[in-house]
Each structure stands twice: as structure tokens, then as C-alpha cells.
Amino acid sequence: MNLAALALVVLLAAPSAPSAPHRYDVEALDALDAMAKAAAGTNDYAMRLIKRELRDTELAPPETIVIKWQRPQRIYLHETDGPRQGQEVLYAPGWNKNKLRVHKGSFPDFNLNMDPYGPTAMAHSHHPVPEISLVRLVDLVLDNVKRAHAKNVGTLTFEGRETLFGRPVTRVEATAPPTGKTPTLEKGQTLWDIAKATGQSMYVILHANRHRGWWQAGHPKSGDAVIVPEFYAGRLVLWIDDELHLPVQIDLYDHEGALYEHYEHHELVVNVGFTPDDFDPKNPKYKF
């Protein structure tokens, strides 16, 4: 048995908390249904994101990023506090040969055109810029909960009403089992190909195989069996704004209980009515 297959067997056989009923609270399902409708009606939004993501075995320092987003995937990112303070990023499908326009905001500062899926662009982010948005986050949560519910596994619980960032919110929690599969990497493939074929996040696949010393999509070799988790997280905690019906915070944990993603959404405003200037590097408010 190869290493990946053995690891998956161990993962599936690992002791867990005592078995609980596959509980899906009506209040939580209603909150997710309202969230789905709100996301479908979101044409653009602005917010201040605070994120912390797992790097190796430690959470990276907090990053504060101002975001403008517009369908289908126009996006402007400006890091206002954190390790890359001053950095600005622009991306739009079909523009700039589908590359990021980036400048780091510190000396020596110059514009770069960057592959959004390349190791440099992915060095400090779990998610490639073409796949970053609040709407995609909602889709990810809904997809995982629906698939678990359909298989009568996992849980979705209503945890009550709270106040977060001065906003009334509903808190829900979801769990999913540590199931998965082990496809074999073919010649010329990377983990991006496995991610595309399976519909799983490349980061989640990379994290599941961390014991093998892989820290980039191109590290595994042809013939390697790759652990691909069926679900994005072992546990997620979601705070949904009671007025906007969109997430204002989410915490995602792996199946060993480690927090690997924490996202806060501050000053969220939807359907702003952005113009092409908001995604133009020539905008005088930007420093490209």
C-alpha cells in the first residue's frame, strides 16, 4: 500500500467524537437559504477583509485588504495593513491576458503581470484571485452542506443570535466527515489538475497531503496517489448578517480540529454600482 493510500486509511479510521445524529436544524437551513438568495442578488460589493490563513503549522499574521468586486469576476485588492501593506492587485477575465496586475507598494515598486495560479501569486494565499469572492464563499458553503445532507452525513446546527462587528447576526455551524479518494497524478499534471477534476480546492488537497512535504501545486510527481478530501472542512462556523443575509465571518477547521482559515468581512456594502474605472489601473486613486 502506498503512502497516500495508507494515510487515507488512517484518516478514515481515526477516532472521532462519539457518533451524533445527522442533525440539520430548520433554522440553520433557512439561514442558508436566505444567504443563497442574497448572494444570487449581489452584482457587486465592497468590504474590508481581515484574513488569517494557515502557513505550515501556524496561522499567518492578520492581513487587512480592501476589496471591490463585480460580476463575473472583476476584482480590486488593496492591502492596507499586514505583511504586504500597500500592495494593490487588479484582475478581470479576459483583461491583461488573464494575468494579475500587481505592484507591491514598497520600494522598489513597479508593476508586474503575474500568473494568478503560479507559485509567486499563491505564496501568501490559499485561493487564487480568479476564485476569490464572497459569492464563491457562499457557493462553497452551500455545496458542502447540500452534499453532506444528501448523503445523510455531517451536521448543520443553529447556534443562536449574536452581535458581531456591531451587526446582528445568526451563527450556524456545520460538520462533515473525513471521507475522500486518492486519484493518481498523471504525467504533466499538477495539483491544479486534480483540483479541477475533483472540484476540490487546491489548498485543501495540499493541506491533506502536508505530511508528504508538498507545499506547492507542482511538487508531487507523476504516479503519486493524492489524497483528495470529499468536503472542504471538518467543521465550519459561520456568522450571517441578519440584514444583508451574507457572511460577515467564517472560521474553517480541518478534521484534526486545526483552524486553517479565518475571514472577517467588515463594512460590507452590496450593489454599489461600480464603473469600469474601479477596475482600471489608470484610476488616479490607485498607485499602479
Language model segments and positions:
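Flexible, processing/modification-adjacent segments and terminal tails
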Residues: 19-33, 37-43, 51, 59, ...
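Generic short beta-strand segments
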Residues: 48-54, 173-178, 253
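Acidic, serine/threonine-rich low-complexity disordered tracts
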Residues: 164-167, 218, 230-238, 242-288
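Hydrophobic helical h-region of N-terminal Sec-dependent signal peptides
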Residues: 6-12
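Primarily a LysM-type cell-wall glycan-binding module
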Residues: 175-202, 224
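A short, surface-exposed beta-strand/turn
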Residues: 68-71, 92-95, 189, 233-248
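Hydrophobic/aromatic beta-strand elements that line small-molecule binding cavities or substrate pockets
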Residues: 35, 63-68, 89-90, 157-162, ...
